[in-house]
C-alpha cells in the first residue's frame, strides 16, 4: 500500500479591507494573539499599511497617545480592527475604492520592527 497523506500547505497571511475595518485571517491573527490594542499607520511611498500590536503593559504605560491606540478584536479564526476614519484615510491616500465586501491583500510580519505590513501593491 502506498498511501499519500494530505498535508495542507500553510496559508499566507491576508488582510481584507472594507470602508469600516481591516479583517485579518487566522495566519495573520497569530501575531495579534497577545495584543491588547494596536497602532495603525501607513507608508504611502511603499504602498503599505502597518499594524503594530501593543501588549497591555505597553498600551497602558502612558507614553503612547490615546488617539494613537485602537482596539482589536481577536477570535480563534480571525481578528479585526474597526476604524472608519483610518479606512477613509487609506482610501484617500492610496486612491482605493473599497466595497462593503472588501478587497483582500497579502500581509507580512516584520520581525525587526515587530509589526504586520499589508501590501497594497497587488490585490489578491
Name what the model sees in each region:
Residues 1-3, 45-124:
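Mature exported/compartmentalized surface modules and terminal targeting/interaction regions
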Residues 13-16, 40-42, 104-109:
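Short, exposed beta-strand/loop patches in secreted or surface proteins that constitute
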Residues 30-48, 53:
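Acidic (E/D-rich), amphipathic helical modules within compact regulatory domains
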Residues 20-33, 83-88:
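Short beta-strand-centered segments at strand-helix junctions
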Residues 9, 34, 101-103:
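Residues that act as N-cap/strand-start positions at coil-to-secondary-structure junctions
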